């Protein structure tokens, strides 16, 4: 609900087609649930999503091809022609398959350095936060076996192997809420991210 009120305040009356840039974090639960709730109240509007990389979405928004971007906000960018509005904050967590040996290990933190990892891509903000968390924990940086931002790929890889994944909490909430994957009880310090909307300024 907050998403659409924020958009209406900037764009005016919502009608016709609303074009959305969807970053990976928003695609599995946040945006689908928001779209379903919105369309129940506004059945005459068409919503179009674009799942391109962040840089491409920004270029499309500057060109007027996208109305807004939803997902993790970039905290280290100074782009005067764009503005952002946070909806909430969340931390990253470590996911693994149910019955993974680390869930029974007396000190799972000690095993993180030698684990096989599914990680965000090297240039993704989430990857930078994760690296900083490992430095804070006094551990060597995790080395990716697979790099991907696709939630379905992460789920399939974890369910079929002993790999670990570091993701934002909401990105895989369906899997954790429905018992498809488990959370390793090792907190990742200083990985809080702001999740929200990015618009053209003005």
Task: Please report, for each region that a protein language model flagged, where it lies by residue.
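Alpha-helical "hinge/linker" immediately C-terminal to small N-terminal DNA-binding modules
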Residues: 1-12, 100
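Secondary-structure junction motif
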Residues: 72, 96, 102-103, 115-137
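Short helix-loop capping/hinge motifs at secondary-structure junctions, enriched
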Residues: 99-109, 188, 202
């Amino acid at each position: 609900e907050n998403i659409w009120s924020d958009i209406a305040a900037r764009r005016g009356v919502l009608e016709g087609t609303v074009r959305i840039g969807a970053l990976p974090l928003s695609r599995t639960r946040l945006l689908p649930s928001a779209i379903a709730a919105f369309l129940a109240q506004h059945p005459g509007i068409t919503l179009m999503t674009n799942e391109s990389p962040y840089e491409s979405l920004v270029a499309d928004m500057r060109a007027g091809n996208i109305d807004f971007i939803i997902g993790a906000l970039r905290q280290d960018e100074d782009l005067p022609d764009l503005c952002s509005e946070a909806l909430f904050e969340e931390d990253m967590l470590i996911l693994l398959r149910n019955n993974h040996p680390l869930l029974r290990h007396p000190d799972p933190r000690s095993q993180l350095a030698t684990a096989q990892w599914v990680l965000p891509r090297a240039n993704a903000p989430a990857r930078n936060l994760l690296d900083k968390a490992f430095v804070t924990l006094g551990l060597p940086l995790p080395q990716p076996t697979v790099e991907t931002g696709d939630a379905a790929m992460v789920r399939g890889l974890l369910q079929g192997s002993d790999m670990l994944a570091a993701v934002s909490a909401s990105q895989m909430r369906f899997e954790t809420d429905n018992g498809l994957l488990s959370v390793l009880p090792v907190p990742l310090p200083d990985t809080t991210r702001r999740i929200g909307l990015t618009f053209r300024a003005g």
